[in-house]
Amino acid sequence: LRWQERLAQTLFAHLPRSLAGAQRLGWVLGWLWWLASPRYRADLAGTLATAGMTNPRLHRQAIGACGVQIVEALWVWQQPWPDVLDTVREVVGWEAVEAARGRGGGLLFLTPHLGCFEITSLWAGERLPITILYRPPRQPWLAKWLTAGRARGGVTLA
């Protein structure tokens, strides 16, 4: 096994049951990754500079947030579907979706990778059939987890 797969297996085996616990773990891992990888530090600094984010406080937040995003996705993929749906606290604008469905025809959701976007499709798939267009991961070993975690409820992958 490659080291990335071994790390992912270890994370899966030891993920906290709570989303808050997973987020704390992700914050720590984001910082460890940043400390351990000169290439990642350079890439992140370049990305933030390109975005015009020069505030050191924002840099520190981004370091932790990158780890949180990765661990949140793993958490969502691993948890039972009802437990994931229970984490949704507020939905804004769903009435527009219902109105569009009432007029017939299809809908296209564009979901940016902000926050824990992995939950968005599962929540929508609970209410209507949904197909996700995605690019399979470059790491073949990751595909089994991604597929199992995303293709649940009314969600189909394409």
What are these regions (language model features)?
Residues 1-111, 143-149, 154:
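Membrane-anchoring hydrophobic helices of lipid-metabolizing enzymes
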Residues 103-158:
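Catalytic core of membrane glycerolipid acyltransferases/transacylases, capturing the structured
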